[in-house]
UniProtKB/Swiss-Prot annotation:
<dbReference type="InterPro" id="IPR009436">
    <property type="entry name" value="AGTRAP"/>
</dbReference>
<keyword id="KW-1133">Transmembrane helix</keyword>
<dbReference type="GO" id="GO:0016020">
    <property type="term" value="C:membrane"/>
</dbReference>
<keyword id="KW-0812">Transmembrane</keyword>
<dbReference type="Pfam" id="PF06396">
    <property type="entry name" value="AGTRAP"/>
</dbReference>
<feature type="topological domain" description="Cytoplasmic">
    <location>
        <begin position="117"/>
        <end position="163"/>
    </location>
</feature>
<feature type="transmembrane region" description="Helical">
    <location>
        <begin position="96"/>
        <end position="116"/>
    </location>
</feature>
<feature type="topological domain" description="Extracellular">
    <location>
        <begin position="1"/>
        <end position="28"/>
    </location>
</feature>
<feature type="topological domain" description="Cytoplasmic">
    <location>
        <begin position="50"/>
        <end position="55"/>
    </location>
</feature>
<comment type="function">
    <text>Appears to be a negative regulator of angiotensin II type I receptor-mediated signaling.</text>
</comment>
<protein>
    <recommendedName>
        <fullName>Type-1 angiotensin II receptor-associated protein-like</fullName>
    </recommendedName>
</protein>
<keyword id="KW-0472">Membrane</keyword>
<dbReference type="GO" id="GO:0038166">
    <property type="term" value="P:angiotensin-activated signaling pathway"/>
</dbReference>
<feature type="topological domain" description="Extracellular">
    <location>
        <begin position="77"/>
        <end position="95"/>
    </location>
</feature>
<feature type="transmembrane region" description="Helical">
    <location>
        <begin position="29"/>
        <end position="49"/>
    </location>
</feature>
<feature type="transmembrane region" description="Helical">
    <location>
        <begin position="56"/>
        <end position="76"/>
    </location>
</feature>
Length: 163
């Protein structure tokens, strides 16, 4: 099964837009915006250097880490911010902002999946095997090197030394 072609620019732009929408109202700490914008800067680095394995790997690891930090920050700050904005004039804006933050969090694992495949296309060497899901390249067209024919020219072979 072939994966759909997903542009790295589209992934970075989507996460940037969702991060901006999530930070529209001041209900999350500055760590949320700082972490996500820093990771998106790594995404811009991965766009700028198309052949860099390090850039795409750092972006992938950063997205994985922001999944954890987003879960932690939402768990710590959501209920208090919801109670504070429940009867105020910013209730709808809080709902929109928190919805965009949650949507960004839900979209990050899919983005990580596409980032991993881009990493493998650029020459990355990490394999992931989850039992029923195997992420690897099809190498059936490669010739095996285990059964190579011996060279025909063995006259130039050096004699073995005895010590």
């Amino acid at each position: 099964m072939e994966l759909p072609a997903v542009n790295l620019k589209a992934i970075v732009f989507t996460h940037w837009l969702l991060t901006v929408f999530a930070c529209m109202i001041d209900w999350l700490p500055k760590a949320y915006g700082l972490a996500n914008i820093t990771i998106l800067a790594m995404g811009v680095w991965a766009i700028a250097q198309r052949d860099s394995i390090d850039a795409i790997f750092m972006f992938l690891i950063g997205l994985l880490l922001t999944i954890l930090t987003d879960i932690l920050l939402f768990a710590l700050y959501f209920t208090e911010a919801e109670k504070a904005s429940e009867s105020g004039p910013l209730r709808d804006l809080f709902r929109f902002s928190s919805g965009m933050g949650i949507f960004s969090l839900l979209l990050k694992p899919l983005s990580c999946f596409f980032m991993y495949h881009m990493y493998r296309e650029r020459g990355g060497e990490y394999f992931v095997n989850l039992g029923f899901i195997t992420l690897s390249r099809d190498r059936s067209s490669y010739q095996s090197i285990e059964h190579m024919d011996p060279p025909a020219d063995q006259d130039n072979k050096l004699p073995s030394r005895t010590y």
